[in-house]
Amino acid sequence: IAGVFEIRDGASVAVRPERCWGCGQCVSVCPVDAIDHDAFPLEKCPLVDNGRQPTAEQLAILMRTRRSARTFAERPVPRDIVRDLVSVSRWGPSAQNSQDVDWVAIDDRARITEMSKATVDEIRRFSRLMRHPVLRGVLRLFLGRELTKSAGSNPRAGEELLDRWTRGLDPIFYNAPVVLVGHTRSRRAFARDDAIYDAYNLMLAAERQGLSTCQIG
């Protein structure tokens, strides 16, 4: 697609290497492993046995059975499993194959509780701003009409979250044993989309590991 290769004298030759955008497709499709890319060394690109791929029906079942859970067992998730999930997530599509989404895993209960309370406090603060007619108009300039309308649809959201918090509930992370935070460079094109795609890959992989998930934010 990028015009890097041309067929000359019956052979594929890299004639415009400067056009390479690092997608790895050339390494992927070569039937005889003749292309060894600096960014995709062959030893790190094992051949995939297509016979082991799930059928369309199996994949559809996985997608249908995945559910967003808000009740979790009080059982730690082994860190090697978390690492495997993060590793799988990067195979989600990304702009220019940047694979620029990084993950922070938090499994410390005190830290998760602190993050949950901070989120409740921030939502309460934002809810108060949305109830002020002048500030609501100013926020519309930054957030846009639709997002402002959505954010202001429940002006009591912050107080409702605080009420649940004071009753000993976790209205943000639902007492999950692990919180995974995906992040990428904010000014990069399609950064948010890339993070969402990676998150969904991770959630499907977690489902096959017997782990429930819920995407927050």
What are these regions (language model features)?
Residues 1-217:
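Acidic, surface-exposed loops and disordered segments
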